Amino acid sequence: MSNNLLLPDKNSRMQREQWKWTRMTLTRAHYKQDNKQCQHWRINSQTTREEWQMLCPGRKWILNLLTRLGLNLMIISRRDQALDMEMSLM
């Protein structure tokens, strides 16, 4: 097997794509009727202590984590909920 088959092409999308770290807040997550999880995100315009802040490089990682936790409905708005969730993710 050639090594060229294992390495991505120099012009591939994967190499051109760069991670952008954006401060996001997960405001709601729930399951749809087809058992697919739906997440509601928003970009933080300002940092407050009343919101759960997270650095999210992509939604797929957190989707998988929340699915493994058995999440079916979550609304994060109060500080105590945010702290509970933050502790469970550690």
Swiss-Prot record:
Disulfide bonds: none
Compartments (UniProt record): Host cytoplasm, Host perinuclear region; Host cytoplasm
Role played: Antagonizes host type-I IFN signaling pathway.
GO biological process per UniProt: symbiont-mediated suppression of host innate immune response
Domain of life: Viruses
Remarks, miscellaneous: Expressed from the S segment by a leaky scanning mechanism.
UniProt organism field: Puumala virus (strain Bank vole/Russia/CG1820/1984)
Keywords, ordered alphabetically: Host cytoplasm, Host-virus interaction, Inhibition of host innate immune response by virus, Inhibition of host RLR pathway by virus, Viral immunoevasion
Major localisation: host cell
Family label: Belongs to the hantavirus NS-S protein family.
Identification of the protein by name: Non-structural protein NS-S
GO cellular component terms given for this protein: host cell perinuclear region of cytoplasm
